[in-house]
Amino acid sequence: MNNIHTPVMATEMLSYLAPVDNETYLDCTFGTGGYSKLILSNCNCKIIAFDRDPAVISIASQFYQQYSNRFTFFNDNFVEANKYLSKSAKLNGIVMDLGVSSMQLDAANRGFSFRYDAELDMRMSQKGYKASELVNEASEHQLADIIYKFGEENKANKIAKHIVLAREKKPITTTLQLANIIREAVGYNNYYKKNKIDSATKTFQAIRIFINDELSAIQNFLNQSLELLAVNGRLIVVSFHALEDAIVKKFMHQNAVKKVAQSKYSTNKQLPLQNGVLHLLTKKIAVPTRTEIINNPRSRSARLRAALKINE
């Protein structure tokens, strides 16, 4: 299993998940198997893993060979978990490592990154609507809305206008072609000085999120997760940008047990609790250590939230 990447915030994930023998855990985003490998190596437990990317099937096959009946894999989006999992068999923990994987970013032919000149694809499942189809067919208004909503890009209108003008001359089919159109629209040097990122970064993020319907999948799965988890089961989510983290934060806080304020004259030392399902294990977000960021710069934007299900 030489192709397994070191997963982000591995120590923190294991600490909050606290896996033990004879329990079952769900890895929503298998990727190259980093989290699954850590959990399976930590104790004699079982893993059920999901990933919609067919490129990871060969890696999952290696896990079947090594872990036999301790490992089960489904080549599908984690939002479809309910279709595969028995309602009577509750999970003891769920881990989610959101966003695009290092494997996908590093595969030039997948079209996720403008570090390579490749076909503008960006599909995690390698099925359906390509990014090139979006940028060549969507209206200027639609493009601006997508770039602003999913990329939080303040210059969305300007970028959308330049994309439409460029495609009138020649179809936009490659990553570098699109990146250069964006850079021409908003500049590069001044944008980098102000934002510390390439001027194409936010637009590429926006298109990827839209193409793969990432945010609604996160929201829909989180809504399912309370039914899937057993009491004392743990939910661990690692996100990489504010849009993902906002969904996770809102979900956990909305479903958290809260203490009810009472009079300072009350003799009841233990505060009564409002209805809720989750106990927050992370009162604030957990972030990577400085050492991890130095060793793995891609971890710098990672944010981890964890919660414990304490009742049905």
Curated annotation (Swiss-Prot):
GO terms for molecular function: rRNA (cytosine-N4-)-methyltransferase activity. Pfam families: Methyltransf_5. The keyword Lipid metabolism does not apply. It is found in: Cytoplasm. SUPFAM superfamilies: Putative methyltransferase TM0872, insert domain, S-adenosyl-L-methionine-dependent methyltransferases. It is an enzyme of class 2 (transferase). GO terms for cellular component: cytoplasm. It catalyses: cytidine(1402) in 16S rRNA + S-adenosyl-L-methionine = N(4)-methylcytidine(1402) in 16S rRNA + S-adenosyl-L-homocysteine + H(+). The keyword Cell membrane does not apply. S-adenosyl-L-methionine binds at residues 33-35, 51, 78, 97, 104. One of its GO terms (biological process) is rRNA base methylation. It comes from the Bacteria. Belongs to the methyltransferase superfamily. RsmH family. Specifically methylates the N4 position of cytidine in position 1402 (C1402) of 16S rRNA. This is Ribosomal RNA small subunit methyltransferase H. It comes from Orientia tsutsugamushi (strain Boryong) (Rickettsia tsutsugamushi). The gene is rsmH.
